[in-house]
Amino acid sequence: MKRLLFAVVALLMCMTVLTACGNEVVYSGTTTKTDSNSSQSEENKMNYEAKPTDALLDINDIKTVEDVTVDDDYATREPEKGETVAIIHTSMGDISMRFLDEIAPLATNSFIALADAGRYDKTIFHRVINNFMIQAGDYTNFNGTGGESAYGTEFDNEVSEYASNVRGSVAMANAGPDTNGSQFYINQCPNDNAYLDGGYTVFGWVYEGMDVVDAIASVATDGMDKPLDDVVIEYIEILEY
């Protein structure tokens, strides 16, 4: 009887994980879900200082690419010496990531420019779902309804069949096709989030600090998936590996 009960509990836990990994979406911008959190938005605006949204880059200066492939081991390979990387310094530890600028130059250049300009400084992970992903990058409203790209406007998806939403990959959140801004998410699902492929731009992956990602994903949240205690991005450091 105890074995049967344990098996049932294990099955229910497995179903919970599959639900988290298979039925969620990653959104940014105004949605029904984030609109209902308006009171929380006002509180965040009092606690955090919104950054300017003026353009930092001319999107026409970024050379886009087509049909570029990446190595099969891109999600596990260490960065090469001299390669540009980012260290996301959070209140819970550091997350180090490398970029897929060869297939996602628009997303990569925007992220780097925003980080260098300090627009991600003192922002929060506003949406956290364990066994799915952690989301951040709203530097104006701090609740998932704001932020702007380094181009001062939305930019197109950069989708490649060679870059998938595997565990540890970093991708742009959006409010629909070609609506990328400043918000990004880190895939944390242990079984990968391949069903998101084709709808979101994967532009990097974590090479060190997934233990921090897991810790952030495990914090207590409210009904809007916002951490009860803010998880803060202190700043994002761009440097050579």
Task: List each language-model region with its residue ranges.
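C-terminal motif of bacterial Sec signal peptides marking the signal peptidase cleavage site
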Residues: 16-20
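Cyclophilin-like peptidyl-prolyl cis-trans isomerases
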Residues: 21-241
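Positively charged n-region of N-terminal signal peptides that target proteins for export
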Residues: 1-4
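Hydrophobic alpha-helical membrane context
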Residues: 14-15, 138
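Sec-dependent N-terminal signal peptides
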Residues: 6-13
